[in-house]
Amino acid sequence: MAQSIRSGHLLVVDRKRRSGLIILKEFHAEFAGPGAAVGGLFDEDCQAVIIIGDSCLMLPESPDERQEAYKIRRQWIRLAQQFTDHSLPTERARMILNQFEIYFDQDTIARVPDAAFAQLVGVLPNTIRLSRRSLHKPSLKVRTQAD
């Protein structure tokens, strides 16, 4: 998949599937969700790709479709930027995990390496690991005498 993205051809993540790509670059990562442009000039520096869900890449069929795909890619980048605007690393980690849990099932998210999420929001992989644990701790019910 990384070779396809680095080929220089503009491709589009299939907008009809609940899927996407985490595109790993040297010092950061970017998420491209359904309908987003990948490849072309955007991703010449792609080092690896993590496929989320049942992802499929397609060639844009028209200039309008290319334009729309660029717009969608920018929207995904802006969403990640909103998370990185928070100064606390734990908050950034929690936000990216919450966002992915809204869109993807728990099993899919569990397969994404901590390092990939970390590169999306500029935190250490250990911060993601700790946030995953705190998000999925079972809540303890305190018994009172009335119970």
Where are the regions a protein language model picked out?
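A small-molecule sensor/coupling module
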Residues: P60-M95
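Short, well-structured alpha-helical interface segments that form or flank functional binding sites
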Residues: F27-G33, L88, N126, L130
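Low-complexity, flexible helical/coil segments
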Residues: V49-I51, R92-I96, A118, L130-R133
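Phosphate-/nucleic-acid-contacting segments
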Residues: E101-D147
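Residue-level detector of alpha-helix boundaries and kinks
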Residues: S19-G20, R78, I102, P113
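DNA-contacting interfaces and partner/effector-binding or oligomerization modules
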Residues: M1-M58
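Short C-terminal domain-edge/linker segments immediately following a structured domain
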Residues: D45, Q82-S87, P125-T127
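Short helix->loop/beta-hairpin flanking segments within DNA-binding domains
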Residues: H86-A110
